[in-house]
């Protein structure tokens, strides 16, 4: 397809990033008309769509004003409605996600928020479009096929942070779009259930899906049951889940042989909680364990006696340990004294001092004589100390 995308990129750079609302809106109208005309004549190929999405990426990159960022994100998401064929709409979403994944490592922390918002607005536009089509299975499957190749995939080349962000906004945007039956919701979540059982995904992604998708569903159910018990009013509507079907799918995934024990335990924990939800019970309610046997007063008295005996044995062990340490130190001192006597290094009795130890006992150690302090020599010259007398270097007695 011979498309003059170079001229369109000039419009992106010069007009769409302009701070003047009139100029920006006029440029967007030109872009919309150009896409509509080109799409009616001949389909865009993937190369054209990738260049288009890259241009849109840098338009968002250059936009620094928050209000204009939100408006631009809505405009970019709304481009899905400009393409004439459903095939082009699906491929545009695919190219948008792939292009953003390539650029994601280069996004700094000051620009990250606006690109996270851009992803959300694109997903919102996509789900709104599907809701208008009553979530027809054949069309919905085409979009979910794209997601399974990008954001719900084991593909290492697709940015993992983008996969996490998509999982974190999925339930919110499905709820906002509305119009889904329980069966359709289960079909939308099935790729994520299968992904939990894939051994190739990282622990980071597994935990993200576990928390952002399935624990969120259970938390919503728990909050609903708590509100009903406390007589609070809850907003009607929102997506509904078939807890029994989701639990059954999780069980099939959990029994796969290649799963490690840690992940299998987490998946089976979800199975139990979804089963409780299907029976109308609070999945996150913790029940205090009740002992199987009832304890009598005699049992408590016996336990008290055993505790006293155990405490006394500990005291006896500590006492014996201190006695052994004392004997070892005494033998060490005797050995050192014998060695000094053999070498003729006897220490006079008047130079033996008694030092009180921490345990209250005293032991004899030799006194240490203090050396004579150094005296500063008067006058000029180098100081010397000979026998405690001060002398000047170069001066004779």
From Swiss-Prot:
It comes from the Eukaryota. It holds the Pfam family Nop52. It is found in: Nucleus. GO terms for cellular component: nucleus; preribosome, small subunit precursor. InterPro entries: RRP1 (IPR010301). Its main location: nucleus. It comes from Caenorhabditis elegans. One of its GO terms (biological process) is rRNA processing. Belongs to the RRP1 family. This is Ribosomal RNA processing protein 1 homolog. Residues 334-366 are annotated as: Disordered. May be involved in the generation of 28S rRNA. Keywords: Nucleus, rRNA processing. Residues 334-343 have a biased composition (Basic and acidic residues).
């Amino acid at each position: 397809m011979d498309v003059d995308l170079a001229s369109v990129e000039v419009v992106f750079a010069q007009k769409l990033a302009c701070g003047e609302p009139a100029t920006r809106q006029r440029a967007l109208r030109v872009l919309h008309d150009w896409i509509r005309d080109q799409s009616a004549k001949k389909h865009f190929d993937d190369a054209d769509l990738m260049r288009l999405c890259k241009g849109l990426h840098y338009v968002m990159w250059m936009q620094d004003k928050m209000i204009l960022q939100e408006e631009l994100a809505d405009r970019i998401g709304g481009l899905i409605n400009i393409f004439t064929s459903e095939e082009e709409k699906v491929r545009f979403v695919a190219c948008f996600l792939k292009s953003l994944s390539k650029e994601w490592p280069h996004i700094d922390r000051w620009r990250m928020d606006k690109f996270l918002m851009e992803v959300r607005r694109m997903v919102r536009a996509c789900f709104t479009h599907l809701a208008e089509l009553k979530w027809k299975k054949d069309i919905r499957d085409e979009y979910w096929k794209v997601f399974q190749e990008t954001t719900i995939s084991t593909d290492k080349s697709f940015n993992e942070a983008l996969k996490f962000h998509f999982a974190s906004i999925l339930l919110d945007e499905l709820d906002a779009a509305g119009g889904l039956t329980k069966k359709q919701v289960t079909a939308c979540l099935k790729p994520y259930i299968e992904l939990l059982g894939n051994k190739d995904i990282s622990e980071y992604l597994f935990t993200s899906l576990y928390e952002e998708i399935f624990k969120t569903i259970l938390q919503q159910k728990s909050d609903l049951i708590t509100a009903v018990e406390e007589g609070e009013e809850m907003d009607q509507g929102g997506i509904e889940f078939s807890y029994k079907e989701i639990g059954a799918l999780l069980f099939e995934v959990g029994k796969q042989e290649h799963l490690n024990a840690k992940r299998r335990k987490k998946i089976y924990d979800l199975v139990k909680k979804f089963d409780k939800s299907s029976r109308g019970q609070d999945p996150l309610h913790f029940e205090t364990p009740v002992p199987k046997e009832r304890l009598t007063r005699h049992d408590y008295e016996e336990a008290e006696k055993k505790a006293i005996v155990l405490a006394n044995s500990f005291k006896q062990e500590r006492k014996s340990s201190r006695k052994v340490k004392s004997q070892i130190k005494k033998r060490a001192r005797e050995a050192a004294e014998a060695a000094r006597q053999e070498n003729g290094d006897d220490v006079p009795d008047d130079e033996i001092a008694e030092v009180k130890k921490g345990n209250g006992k005293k032991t004899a150690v030799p006194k240490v004589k203090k050396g004579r302090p150094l005296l500063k020599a008067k006058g000029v010259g180098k100081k010397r100390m000979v026998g405690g007398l001060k002398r000047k270097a170069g001066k004779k007695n």
